[in-house]
Amino acid sequence: MNVSFSIAPYFFKERRAKLNSFRKRKVEIVAEIDSLLKNSSSLAIVEYRGLTVNELEQLRKEFKSAGVLSKVYKNRLFKIAAENNGYLDLQTDLVGPNLFAFGTTDAIAPAKIIAKNAKEQPLLILKGGIYDNQVVSAAENALISALPSYTEALTMLASGLQSPLKQLAFGLKLLIDEQKITA
């Protein structure tokens, strides 16, 4: 009987130490999520239930090539970090297996990549997220994915400014060729 009492304190001490290490790791993960939420320009939450490992790896490769950080976190830990940063409305989207895509360089890139892949893989569901420090719904995230990226917008602007000048130059060249005006 005394033997069982002498083993018990050792067992509970070891178990308590293991639980403390798990708790420390969870605190570190919440701090990591906090940092990502503060430093990233956008966040898209994706449900990936039913995807194969190869499909998920391909999605992650696309994210990486676009400068998007993608990670899987426990929803409970993400809820804690979201509450710490004032994103209480995200809690409704934190159900099921979720992949969190943080836009670091281009704010629209996560939503664009997910929308493109969702056409090929219907099991990929774009949920809500954060854009411009505002919580957005799945519908708003879909609208954001339709927006042009920064470089695409600049290209559209440049071509819009260039088009009238090209038409003027072409018209003047035709008039010169027909010799209605002299150069």
Swiss-Prot record:
InterPro entries: Ribosomal_uL10 (IPR001790), Ribosomal_uL10-like_sf (IPR043141), Ribosomal_uL10_bac (IPR022973), Ribosomal_uL10_bac_type (IPR047865). Keywords: Ribonucleoprotein, Ribosomal protein, RNA-binding, rRNA-binding. Pfam families: Ribosomal_L10 (PF00466). Part of the ribosomal stalk of the 50S ribosomal subunit. The N-terminus interacts with L11 and the large rRNA to form the base of the stalk. The C-terminus forms an elongated spine to which L12 dimers bind in a sequential fashion forming a multimeric L10(L12)X complex. Forms part of the ribosomal stalk, playing a central role in the interaction of the ribosome with GTP-bound translation factors. NCBIfam families: PRK00099.1-1. This is Large ribosomal subunit protein uL10.
